[in-house]
Amino acid sequence: MRVHTCYFCSGPVYPGHGIMFVRNDSKVFRFCRSKCHKNFKMKRNPRKVAWTKAYRKAHGKEMVYDTALAVTAARRNVPVRYDRNVIATTLNAMKRVSQVHAKRERLFYKKRLAGKRAQELQEAQKLIAQNVPQFTEPEGEVETAEVQEPQIVSDEEYTMEEEVAEPVKIPVLAKKRKNKKSRNSSSAMQMD
């Protein structure tokens, strides 16, 4: 089973899926979904459309080239004679390649997000510097807060305070409703 790649977003196009467009010069374009086909017809550049792999790689959001994957991604159209030893080594190599790729990807994302924390901190400091009056308390309030001492309340006083506070009932006036009969009779009189 051959899995093609989408010309626009570089996603996988499985057999029986997607759209294939063949130009007059017999150049074949495969698209995974109508979204990609429409963007291609609008002559959009995949490197400038944010959700494509080309954009992500161009802007340093994904690894550009991984040599570990180059071995598995190569196409071999010429059949090779079966050899048990070769198959065993390739299976081991495939497992190893996936481990190496996963490790490299983790390191790439860690390195990519490492500067994010420092950048957020810097932006927060800049915001505070711009809005100094908002983030600082007035001097009068600071002094009164320091002068007040915490009061220690015994359990007995605490329970007495709770008992004193009783819920206050507020009467709610309900609207008076008219009978349906009285409404009907009044409307009948108006019609005559």
Swiss-Prot record:
Provide the protein's localization: Cytoplasm; Nucleus
InterPro entries xrefs: L24e/L24_sf, Ribosomal_eL24, Ribosomal_eL24-rel_N, Ribosomal_eL24_CS, TRASH_dom
Which UniProt keywords are listed? Answer: Cytoplasm, Nucleus, Ribosome biogenesis
Highest rank taxon of the organism:
Eukaryota
Q: Which GO terms describe its biological process?
A: assembly of large subunit precursor of preribosome; ribosomal large subunit biogenesis
Q: List where Acidic residues composition bias occurs.
A: 154-165
Q: Which PROSITE patterns match?
A: RIBOSOMAL_L24E
Role description: Involved in the biogenesis of the 60S ribosomal subunit. Ensures the docking of nog1 to pre-60S particles. Activates and recruits ATPase afg2 to cytoplasmic pre-60S ribosomal particles.
Q: How does it assemble?
A: Associated with nucleolar and cytoplasmic pre-60S particles. At the end of biogenesis it dissociates from cytoplasmic pre-60S particles and is likely to be exchanged for its ribosomal homolog, rpl24.
Question: What is this protein's name?
Answer: Ribosome biogenesis protein rlp24
Q: What is the lineage of its organism?
A: Eukaryota, Fungi, Dikarya, Ascomycota, Taphrinomycotina
Gene symbol of the encoding locus: rlp24
